Swiss-Prot record:
SUPFAM superfamilies, per the entry: An anticodon-binding domain of class I aminoacyl-tRNA synthetases, Nucleotidylyl transferase
Molecular function per GO: ATP binding; glutamate-tRNA ligase activity; tRNA binding; zinc ion binding
Organism this protein belongs to: Francisella tularensis subsp. tularensis (strain WY96-3418)
Gene3D superfamilies hit by this protein: 1.10.10.350, HUPs (3.40.50.620)
Binding of ATP, residues: 239
Record note on cofactor: Binds 1 zinc ion per subunit.
Known EC number: 6.1.1.17
Catalysed reactions listed for this entry: tRNA(Glu) + L-glutamate + ATP = L-glutamyl-tRNA(Glu) + AMP + diphosphate
Protein name: Glutamate--tRNA ligase
Protein family (similarity comment): Belongs to the class-I aminoacyl-tRNA synthetase family. Glutamate--tRNA ligase type 1 subfamily.
Biological role stated in the UniProt entry: Catalyzes the attachment of glutamate to tRNA(Glu) in a two-step reaction: glutamate is first activated by ATP to form Glu-AMP and then transferred to the acceptor end of tRNA(Glu).
The keyword Cytoplasm belongs to this UniProt entry's keyword annotation: yes
A GO biological process held by the record: glutamyl-tRNA aminoacylation
Positions occupied by motif 'KMSKS' region: 236-240
């Protein structure tokens, strides 16, 4: 069975590069009816935090990237790592090393001064050193000294590294804790991982890990190293370019569907297709079409995709996110139109759900403020008479008539004729009075969504405050 994994370290937030790796791994497993494993690599006890673990789990849940089976934590597997280390020592494939920090520092300085490759010189490799109680030591993996480590990377092609370039790396620290490169191999063997899709910053770790696989007589999985994501300027994507924490995108009003659709196309292609449902992603995804070159993050394209999903999604699919953003504003959504109806009207005018909530606030809050420029431009000496006539005409409508935007639009037109002015001389001041600004959806729709009571109350208030 095809089995992939996403294995983040909980030392910070879940960034978009990690999300893309998780997405590719998840899609490949789903495409092949396989399993997707989530593993928290928390062996860095000083830097790992529960807050970061929670951020990772929240991000994966928000995006809908559900793992199969339990979530694995490396800190709960220390006994297993120690067991394998002892097996390697017993088989002569690892050894105890008593070299002090001072000796290793002197060795490094000597190598640098003489333009030699830095790394451990193997002093304890064949010394058969057995640590005595109280002595400080580490355990090193006995890396092959000859030959070449080669693998066919699913993205980068054939890669070969001479074993002369690799030293005997530490697999157990002096405090007894196992190291990253060792733990991931044991985990991937025990979890039957067949395909490892990860960032290409791990390429240098791969030959070391392959040698451990071979020492443990295990099958070496397929590696697919995905290029990094760059900012729009070609530099490595960072905070200075904008949000990199995936949950910040939620706070900024982006839909998870838009994030996933954008990231799947960031370094992977399926013809000219731009818009993908989750089902379409799963069906089309493969490793062969991952681009070997870095991709630039285009914030404008992400915004375009987000607008598409706000406009085109079924309301049920985005309702949770819409309600989340309205809740953040403190607006009482029971004091206004149905959100489903509102989104259908406002979607064309916004790029994010933050914009949606902000630009729709006047539908739910009676505490509207008037835009000074709009008042100056549209409220004139004659506006009071127009408002009086509008109130008279609106009051004459029954509840059923108020549900028809065309009827309401015609009332505005009729009022313009009665006052012998153009439609704009009525519609624009009316907008200012009922929304606070000169911008809103079609005036008939705006009036319907606000409802008769709000419109009459706001017109009355505007008549008193703006038409003195």
């Amino acid at each position: 069975m095809i089995t992939t994994r996403f294995a983040p370290s909980p030392t910070g937030f879940l960034h978009v590069g990690g999300v893309r790796t998780a997405l590719f791994s998840w899609l490949y497993a789903k495409n092949n009816n396989g399993k997707f494993i989530l593993r928290i690599e928390d062996t860095d006890l000083e830097r790992s935090t529960q807050e970061a673990v929670d951020a990772i789990l929240d991000g994966m849940s928000w995006l809908g990237l559900k793992n199969d089976g339990e979530i694995y934590y490396q800190t709960k597997r220390f006994d297993r790592y120690k067991e394998v280390i002892q097996e390697l020592i017993a088989d002569g494939k690892a050894y105890y090393c008593s070299c002090s920090k001072e000796r290793l520092e002197e060795l490094r300085e000597y190598q640098q001064a003489n333009n030699l490759k830095t790394g451990y010189d193997g002093k304890c490799r064949d010394a058969n050193y057995i640590p005595q109680q109280g002595e400080s030591y580490v355990v090193r993996f006995k890396n092959p000294q000859d030959g070449v480590v080669s693998w066919d990377d699913a993205v980068k092609g054939r890669i070969s590294i001479s074993n002369h370039e690799l030293d005997d790396m530490i697999i157990q620290r002096a405090d007894g804790s196992p190291t990253y490169n060792f733990c991931v191999v044991v985990d991937d063997i025990d979890m039957a991982i067949t395909h490892i899709i990860r960032g290409d910053d791990h390429v240098n770790n791969t030959p070391k890990q392959i040698n451990i696989y071979k020492a443990l007589n295990a099958n070496v999985p397929v590696f697919a190293h995905v290029p990094m994501i760059l900012g729009p300027d070609g530099a490595k994507l960072s905070k200075r370019h904008g949000a990199v924490n995936v949950m910040q995108y939620r706070e900024d009003g982006y839909l998870p569907q838009a994030i996933l659709n954008y990231l799947v196309r960031l370094g992977w292609s399926h013809g000219d297709q731009e818009i993908f449902s989750i089902e379409e992603m799963i069906k089309a995804f493969n490793l062969e079409h991952i681009n070997a070159s870095p991709s630039r993050f285009d914030f404008e394209k992400l915004k375009w995709l987000n607008k598409h999903y706000i406009k085109e999604s079924k309301f049920d699919d985005i309702q949770t996110e819409v309600e989340y953003h309205f809740a953040k504003t403190g607006l009482d959504i029971s004091n206004g139109p149905d959100l489903k109806e509102l989104v259908a009207v406002m979607a064309e005018k916004v790029d994010t759900l933050v914009e949606l909530a902000e630009k729709s606030s006047y539908f739910y809050s009676d505490d509207i403020s008037y835009d000074e420029n709009a008042v100056k431009k549209h409220i004139k000496a004659s506006t009071g008479e127009i408002f009086v006539k509008l109130l008279e005409n609106f009051e004459a409508l029954d509840a059923q008539q108020w549900q028809d935007p065309d009827v309401l639009h015609n009332i505005v037109s009729t009022t313009a004729e009665q006052c012998q002015v153009g439609m704009g001389k009525v519609g624009m001041p009316l907008r200012v009075a009922i929304t606070g600004s000169g911008q809103s959806p079609d005036i008939g729709i705006t009036l319907k969504l606000l409802g008769k009571n709000k419109v009459v109350a706001r017109l009355t208030k505007a008549l008193e405050e703006l038409c003195k």
